[in-house]
Structures are given as C-alpha cells and as structure tokens.
Amino acid sequence: MTTPSTSTAPKTLYQKVWDAHVVATPEGEAPIIYVDRHLVHEVTSPQAFSGLKVAGRKLRAPEKTFATMDHNTSTRSASLDALSPMARTQVETLAQNCKDFGVRLYDIHHPNQGIVHVMGPELGITLPGTVIVCGDSHTATHGAFGALAFGIGTSEVEHVLATQTLRQLKAKTMKIEVRGQVTDGVTAKDIVLAIIGKIGMDGGTGYVVEFCGEAIEALSMEGRMTVCNMAIEMGAKAGMVAPDQTTFDYLEGREFAPKGEDWAEAVAAWKALKTDVGAEFDASVVLDAADIAPQLTWGTNPGQVVAIDAPVPNPADEANPTIRASMEKALDYIGLTAGTPMTDVAINKVFIGSCTNSRIEDLRSAAKQAKGRKVASGVTAIVVPGSGQVKAQAEAEGLDKIFIEAGFEWRLPGCSMCLAMNDDRLEAGDRCASTSNRNFEGRQGRGSRTHLVSPAMAAAAAIAGHFVDIRKPY
C-alpha cells in the first residue's frame, strides 16, 4: 500500500483537496478517499438504505449525511396526497430510512426543504476544501465553494453511508479561464453555455475543471454555482472555483458553517485553497468575456448553443460528418430550420427554476424583466424557487407579487420541470424557454422541446412570446 504524496511541487486547487482526502492507495487499486458531506434525496437512496438493512450495517457518520425531498415532490401542494403513488412511496421511504438511521431530513413540510444543491450551500453544509457526494449528476454545483463535489451511483451511495469513504480514480486537471468582464445582459448561465459551446459536451471528459479568470471572480456565489452546476454538461467529473472573500462572506453565519474562533481558523485555512503559481494543468481553455453574448440552445444537447443574435446553424456548414448528422437529427426533433434568427423562435412554455437557476439572484434577474409587464397570450410560465429559504426571501422582497401580477405562476420549492419525474412536465410539441441544465430529447416530457437560457432571457421570452435579445428594448 502506498502513502499519499508529500511532494512540495506546485499544486492545483483540485490536487490540494484530493491529497488531503486520500485515506489509502492499495497497490493496483483505485485510491480510497474520505467523504466530508453526503447529500441524499428520495430517488437514488432507497436501494442504498435497503442494502444496509439487509447487511445489518449502520451509518458510519450519520451526522455527515443530510437528506431532502426534491426530485418528485409537488410544487403545487405540500400534501402527500398531491404526489403520484410512486413519488409518495419514495418520499415516505426516505422519511422512514432517515428515522431508522438517524439522518437529518428536510422533508416537504420543513421550512428549509429544497433542491439538494440549493439547500446544501445556503445552510452552510457546503464548505471549502471538503469532499461532497450525492446520488445526483449535478453535485458539481458545490464546487463553487472550492469543494470537490461529484455525483455517485446508488451502489456508491450505500458504500459512503456504510464507510464514509469512496474508491475513486484521480482525474486529470483542466483550467478554464474567462478573461475580462462580461457586458450588460450577460450572466453566469451565458458564460457556462458559451464554454460548453466552445469545448463540446465531451470536452471535459476525464477532467476536474477549475474555472478562473476575472469574469469568474466577479460572479456572486449564486453565479459560480450556476457555472459549476453545468460542469457535468461538458463531460467533467467536477467543477471548482477557488474560495475568496466572496465565498467567506456568503458562508459566514450560516447554520453549519464554523462559528467563533473556529470560523477564523477555517478562513485562514481556506485562503490556502488556490492553485499555486507554477502548477501545471493537463489542459487549458481560454475565453474572452467581452465576446460572450446572451446564449440559448438550439438543439438537443447543451453544446448545441448559439448567441441570441445568431441564426440557427446550418448542418451543411459542418465538415465533420458525424457532427453534421447529429445537427440534422437535432433540428428535426427540435423543429427548427437552419438560418432562422433565434429571435424569431416562438415559445409557449417558460420554466424558471432548477438547481442551475433557482436562487434569489436568479429570481431577482427574472423579476426585473417581468416587472410591469404581462406574460404573452398563449404562454404558460412558472417560477419555482429552489428552497424554502429562497421562497421566503423572494416573498419578503415582493418578487412573488411581481411575477404573479405579470401572469407567472409562483410555486413551492422542488426540482419541478427540470425533468419529467413529477407533475410539472411539458406536453409533446411544447417549446420551452428553460433555466435548467439539460435539453435532451424528452427531458421535460415526451416530445418536449427545450431551449436552455438564463433567468432573464426566460422571463423576457415569456413576456414577448419568443426569444429576445435582452440587451435591446423589446
């Protein structure tokens, strides 16, 4: 068995967090790493808890496991009667498992209940330098705090519950630097969509990505979470941003963040969580923030994306036959014609929410577009806050009234229309401006057509009835 590296060579942020968590490296096997926080929800945990019961095992560290109900909960009612039979079984099973194993649960009646990747950070469960896992592919969200966070499968969920460790191969490192500052109307969602458009859906495969540069540093924690949330959409194992004063200001005073003298000690340690001068990455990508316009997807994966002032791409212009065929297939499904201005594309549904864009900053941005206006005739638009805390804050600021007066539906927290796993889903043929993270075929409902955009772009589309360039009057 080998021991963790004690090299004094310059290290990347990822390498520092990784090295601090390697428990053992058995010869010829994947390293074993320690897990600081384990987040669970109702969909990927039942089999894991069942496996523990069959084996007669207890949780290794129940105090480091946090559960919520989010994926298939209703955003119309907090009553169990509002759930489908399968959804009700899943939430009731999670409640019983948490009771049996001593796990802290934020159920549908708890004021802090919400989407796992919204709730965790706002409670201070997510901290810099920690390893965080969850049975959900968008766990990379927490990397915005300088944590190493990634999704795991159900069998791995069971393993972490039982041992608080995980076998994991070390990833390669990639630096994605966004230089300069974005212009007005360009958000974190536009930045990450532009990145995916540049490197493709598989450009980050095998890597842990560190996002850096002036444009990233200028983002709020909400914005950084949006960027890291979609690291998986470029194929990356995880995404990370080095913690700084913005991070510390966000975390201070939150329920599970260190307090008193422990806080000062923690911040001192967190300040060392940055890539050393001279550290080498396996790959690097650079974007100029000034070149990024508001983005939206035109096809059936997040990499099929263009600027709002561009037309629908023409597959005939693509030299690679495989990519060309993929573009043709996407256009056929999405029902668009090459050369059509994206501002001419009409929508009939709008979804503002998801673990990508349901935080208070996102809702403020959308409300700014909606204030004093009305949702277009024939358009149904819903706003789903990411957690009970976000909902309460938005209502305290009067954002709910702005949305309701404009004709939007104001809902309860949950994953909602991000995925067709609950009652919020699209019908075949619907075209939706969505602030979620995936636009795959059928993602929001069988035959549904999804265009990924920022909250501001989604709200503007709801008002206009079609996509608009929010940098211009409409």
Swiss-Prot record:
The record, for InterPro entries, names: 3-IsopropMal_deHydase_lsu (IPR004430), Acnase/IPM_dHydase_lsu_aba_1/3 (IPR015931), Acoase/IPM_deHydtase_lsu_aba (IPR001030), Aconitase_4Fe-4S_BS (IPR018136), Aconitase_4Fe-4S_dom (IPR036008), IPM_dehydratase_rel_enz (IPR050067), IPMI_cat (IPR033941)
Q: Provide the leader sequence positions.
A: none
**Cofactor binding mode and count:** Binds 1 [4Fe-4S] cluster per subunit.
Q: Which Gene3D superfamilies match?
A: Aconitase, domain 3
Task: From the record, give the transmembrane residue ranges.
Answer: none
Q: What class of enzyme is it?
A: lyase
Q: What is its cofactor?
A: [4Fe-4S] cluster
GO MF terms on file? 3-isopropylmalate dehydratase activity; 4 iron, 4 sulfur cluster binding; metal ion binding
Identify the keywords attached in UniProt to this record, alphabetized.
4Fe-4S, Amino-acid biosynthesis, Branched-chain amino acid biosynthesis, Iron, Iron-sulfur, Leucine biosynthesis, Lyase, Metal-binding
The catalytic activity, as recorded, is: (2R,3S)-3-isopropylmalate = (2S)-2-isopropylmalate
Provide one Gene Ontology biological process annotation. L-leucine biosynthetic process
| Residues that bind [4Fe-4S] cluster | 355, 415, 418
Q: Does the keyword Ion transport apply?
A: no
Q: Sorted alphabetically, which Pfam families does this protein's record hold?
A: Aconitase
**Pathway it acts in?**
Amino-acid biosynthesis; L-leucine biosynthesis; L-leucine from 3-methyl-2-oxobutanoate: step 2/4
Per the UniProt entry, the Enzyme Commission number(s) are 4.2.1.33
User: Sorted alphabetically, which HAMAP family does this protein's record hold?
Assistant: LeuC_type1
Q: Give the matching NCBIfam families.
A: leuC (TIGR00170), PRK05478.1 (NF004016), PRK12466.1 (NF009116)
What the protein does comes down to: Catalyzes the isomerization between 2-isopropylmalate and 3-isopropylmalate, via the formation of 2-isopropylmaleate.
What's the subunit arrangement here? Answer: Heterodimer of LeuC and LeuD.
Q: Which family does it belong to?
A: Belongs to the aconitase/IPM isomerase family. LeuC type 1 subfamily.
Spell out the protein name for this chain.
3-isopropylmalate dehydratase large subunit
Q: Which organism is it from?
A: Shewanella sp. (strain MR-4)
Q: Which gene encodes it?
A: leuC
